[in-house]
């Protein structure tokens, strides 16, 4: 998400976590002008739990710490299982059918049952609820090698003018995306394909690639 970030506080003492969080809130409020909520915990999943609770603390500091075992259990008891980071609607419904309604219910579940029914990803979430670190902090992602914008048309496109408008629209979106990432492209490829699910008409597909004279993220050069 563009409106959140994970920070590692290893170089600070546990006693200073809350003060550091207050300083971050004040700095963002001063520089950006928006309020933020902060969750502090031992791993990503629990920090998301803490942040979820912090957002509801509208009249308080909007900073929640989940550090020790007691804090973990108290926090998980008031959190719905569907509010756990990584638990989607389908998994939520499955868990509720098995009498797991809160995050604490999942926390208390048999780890063998979790591994059998929720797989590796579910087990990872389960272990993080118990305080383990299973999802690493990625300090810097690898630069993207390509940016793709493609859509399926709702209706048949039969005119060149309409197709041209769509291509310009997608090229605009692609250039916006690479600019937002601070990147430039060396080439651009346009491809089209007929409806592969329509067996009544002859299939068609084609692609054309244009190499830029120099790397660019300027739409007018595309």
Named regions from a protein language model:
Residues 96-222:
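DNA-contacting surface of Y-family translesion DNA polymerases
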Residues 1-127:
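Gly/Gly-Pro- and Ser/Thr-rich, intrinsically disordered tail segments characteristic of DNA damage-repair
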């Amino acid at each position: 998400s563009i409106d959140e970030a994970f920070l590692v506080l290893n170089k600070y003492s546990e006693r200073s976590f809350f003060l550091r969080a207050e300083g971050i809130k004040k700095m963002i409020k001063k520089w950006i002008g928006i309020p933020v909520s902060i969750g502090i915990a031992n791993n990503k999943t629990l920090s998301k739990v803490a942040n979820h609770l912090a957002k509801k603390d509208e009249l308080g500091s909007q900073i929640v710490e989940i550090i020790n075992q007691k804090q973990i259990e108290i926090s998980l008891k008031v959190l719905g299982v569907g509010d756990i980071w990584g638990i989607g609607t389908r998994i939520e419904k499955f868990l509720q059918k098995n009498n797991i309604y809160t995050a604490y219910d999942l926390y208390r579940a048999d780890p063998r049952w979790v591994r059998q029914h929720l797989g590796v990803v579910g087990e990872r979430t389960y272990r993080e609820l118990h305080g383990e670190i299973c999802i690493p902090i990625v300090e810097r992602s690898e630069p993207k090698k390509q940016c793709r914008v493609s859509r399926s048309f709702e209706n048949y496109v039969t005119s060149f003018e309409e197709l041209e408008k769509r291509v310009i629209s997608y090229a605009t979106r692609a250039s916006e995306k690479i600019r937002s990432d601070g990147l430039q492209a060396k080439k651009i490829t346009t491809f089209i394909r007929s409806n592969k699910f329509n067996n009544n008409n002859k299939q068609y597909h084609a692609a054309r690639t244009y190499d830029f004279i120099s790397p660019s993220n300027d739409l007018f050069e595309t």
